[in-house]
């Protein structure tokens, strides 16, 4: 999809102009530093899916190639653990706090 170009000045103006939380839908191609800066510039909620599912798919491929096991519970657990790791990482990057 190419390199993301983020207009932080525009984001600042939007945040200043409207009294509602701002949501980022998708983050393909963004780095941890990009996410941190987006939060600093007013993003309140971040939706991401692709990175999580790609990590899960890669983990399942690696598991199947290494073990030759294709039982559903093994595949689901491998997928779950990989996706959980991505979500946990992003929660830390986003600076998410419990409510």
Where is each model-derived feature located?
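Active-site beta-loop-alpha junctions enriched in small/polar residues
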Residues: 25-29, 49-51
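Short active-site-adjacent structural elements
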Residues: 31-34, 54-59, 63
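Alpha-helix-loop-beta-strand connector modules within alpha/beta enzyme cores
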Residues: 3-24
